[in-house]
């Protein structure tokens, strides 16, 4: 499991505890599987804090991997490169470049406008994205530690100027919310005018 940051809508420590005790024995046989967790220091601290209160957790079922911005790591055939996000400013929140040797995805969920050091890294590494998935939580409102449609357009144009995308690159918007007062169908019509695709539960994308 790869975590971007420690906000509770992304990191459910209670469910991790369930996975590390006999409650999960049906799907996870003792001494057979280890839960591999990747995250920053804040993610580790949150997990360890809740684990310390649960006497039934078996720590041998978990292996934590500390990840940091701009330091790639691999899980199976996938290469992950963490990038700095603009989100939860009291920790190093992350987004990811994910590559499988054929295609490259920018996973920019839960972030405001990308920091310059992140954009500089993308440009310096000459990364080209086949798919860009962007946070759009703010909708038609001004962005903050989340992006809205304006920031989505600006990021796409910046990536184009950097030659980090191609005419065939697909752009998906995720993490949208009700804060801008629009239902999904209304917002979908708006983003469609900008050439974006709005995600939904169960969406599968083939690259």
Which sequence ranges carry the predicted segments?
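Active-site metal-binding motif and surrounding structural segment of the metallo-beta-lactamase
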Residues: 1-37, 127-132
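Divalent metal-coordination and catalytic microenvironments
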Residues: 5, 37, 80, 96, ...
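Metal-dependent catalytic neighborhoods of phosphoester/phosphodiester hydrolases
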Residues: 12-25, 49, 180-189
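Alpha-helix termini
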Residues: 20-31, 53-59, 123-127, 157-168
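Short internal beta-strands
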Residues: 33-44, 133, 172-174
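Active-site regions of enzymes building and remodeling cell-envelope glycoconjugates
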Residues: 61-64, 79-81, 191-198
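Core dinuclear metal-dependent hydrolase active-site scaffold
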Residues: 66-121, 203-207
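Cap/insert and terminal regions of metallo-dependent hydrolase folds
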Residues: 114-203
């Amino acid at each position: 499991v790869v975590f971007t940051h420690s906000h509770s809508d992304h990191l459910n420590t209670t469910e991790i505890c369930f996975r590390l005790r006999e409650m999960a024995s049906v799907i996870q046989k003792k001494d057979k599987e280890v839960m591999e967790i990747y995250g920053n220091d804040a993610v580790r601290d949150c997990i360890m804090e809740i684990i310390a209160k649960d006497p039934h957790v078996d720590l041998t079922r978990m292996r934590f991997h500390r990840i940091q911005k701009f330091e790639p790591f691999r899980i199976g055939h996938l290469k992950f490169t963490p990038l700095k996000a603009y989100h939860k400013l009291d920790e190093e929140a992350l987004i990811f470049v994910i590559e499988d040797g054929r295609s490259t995805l920018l996973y920019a969920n839960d972030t405001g406008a990308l920091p310059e050091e992140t954009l500089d890294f993308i440009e310096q590494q000459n990364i080209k994205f086949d798919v860009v998935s962007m946070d759009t939580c703010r909708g038609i409102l001004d962005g903050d530690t989340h992006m809205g449609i304006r920031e989505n357009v600006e990021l796409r144009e910046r990536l184009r100027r950097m030659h980090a995308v191609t005419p065939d690159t697909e752009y998906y918007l995720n993490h949208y919310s009700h804060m801008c007062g629009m239902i999904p169908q209304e917002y979908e019509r708006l983003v469609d005018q900008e050439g974006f695709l709005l995600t939904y539960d169960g969406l599968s994308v083939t690259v």
